[in-house]
A protein has these predicted regions:
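Active-site gating loop/helix substructures
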Residues: 76-137
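Conserved active-site and cofactor/substrate-binding residues in soluble primary-metabolism enzymes
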Residues: 3-4, 33, 37, 41, ...
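C-terminal functional extensions of proteins
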Residues: 175-289
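Conserved phosphate- and dinucleotide-binding cores of soluble alpha/beta proteins
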Residues: 1, 124, 136, 140-193, ...
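Electropositive, gly/pro-rich neighborhoods at or near active sites that engage anionic ligands
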Residues: 1-101, 256-258, 271-289
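Structural motif
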Residues: 130-132, 161-163, 198
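Glycine-rich phosphate/diphosphate-binding loops and the adjacent beta-loop-alpha structural elements
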Residues: 22-50, 134-141, 167-173, 204, ...
Length: 289
């Protein structure tokens, strides 16, 4: 979805706070632009001006001084649809959580949307593939619905890590523990493909719990033993940010991932010297926080 591309660009950008705020801004009022994201419109304009989405993302990346590269899974306009456990079909990303039904499986239209060659190549060349965190059924799983992407993920020799959400998402993952999140990913891939799952084992405060209970959201239980029975190694960690909202602490999460890179000595596979040096510096900075 365009919003996911926008969020990835903003997250990787070496940006000023104003630029981040404007890229995430949604128009208000009664104008025809009301509800639309400036960032989405900007990316769409760049894609049209540059002759395609990949070229548009590349140009946007230059403007935002993005470190890394954001590559779409497919260039086709797709529509998500969910089959619920009661047999009903819900169409559209925004409509799926509104149904407040348990999801059996996800699909997309057109079902044969081709993967971008650059995305497939990036997956096959990767040392690590990281899934999540994010909306399980409408952000993470949609990538696996693109056949070429799913096949590349399964074929890839990269270490595959899933970062499980810390709270359930109303309308999508009601009542889910970490095990159900992992099960859903495996079901959509058609095979067990994960090597590691990072789960939160930090307790949510009573004040935070009360705030989320009003919205129908609950902490995701780590389910360590159940996941390990699938042949997946679980990394339980205190991951919650100290702020009011229950979110992953980005510094803690980065430290867990970088520590795993060191432990597996993945920097010897394909990560270049300057990347290795950057990671060492990053680790030192994270330990100070």
């Amino acid at each position: 979805p365009p919003g996911d591309l926008r969020n990835c660009l903003v997250a990787l950008a070496d940006r000023e706070p104003l630029m981040e705020r404007i890229m995430q801004y949604r128009f208000k009022g009664d104008s025809p632009l009301a509800g639309h994201s400036f960032g989405n419109l900007f990316i769409a304009a760049m894609a049209e001006a540059e002759g395609g989405m990949e070229a548009g993302l590349s140009a946007t990346s230059q403007i935002l001084n993005v470190r890394g590269k954001v590559v779409p899974s497919t260039l086709r306009d797709i529509r998500l649809k969910a089959e619920m456990t009661d047999g009903s079909i819900i169409n559209g990303e925004s409509e799926i959580p509104k149904a407040h039904k348990r999801i059996r499986t996800m699909a997309m239209e057109p079902a044969d949307a081709p993967a971008t060659a650059s995305a497939v190549q990036a997956i096959l060349n990767a040392d690590i593939l990281i899934f999540g965190p994010g909306s399980l059924y409408t952000s993470v799983i949609p990538n696996l619905l693109v056949t070429g992407i799913r096949d590349a993920v399964i074929k890839s020799e990269a270490v595959k890590i899933y970062i499980c959400n810390v709270m359930t998402q109303p309308g999508e993952t009601d009542g889910y523990g970490a095990f159900e999140h992992v099960q859903a990913l495996i079901q959509q891939a058609g095979t067990q493909f994960l090597d590691y799952v990072i789960v939160n084992d930090q307790r949510v405060t009573a004040a935070q719990l009360a705030q989320y209970n009003e919205k129908g959201s609950m902490p995701v239980t780590p389910d360590i033993k159940k996941i390990e029975r699938l042949g997946i190694q679980v990394i339980p960690t205190r991951l919650i940010s100290n702020k009011d909202l229950v979110r992953h602490n980005p510094q803690k999460l980065a430290q867990v991932i970088i520590s795993l890179v060191y432990r597996l000595r993945l920097f010897g596979k394909g990560i270049q010297f300057f990347d290795y040096f950057f990671m060492r510096q990053s680790m030192r900075e994270l330990k100070k926080k």
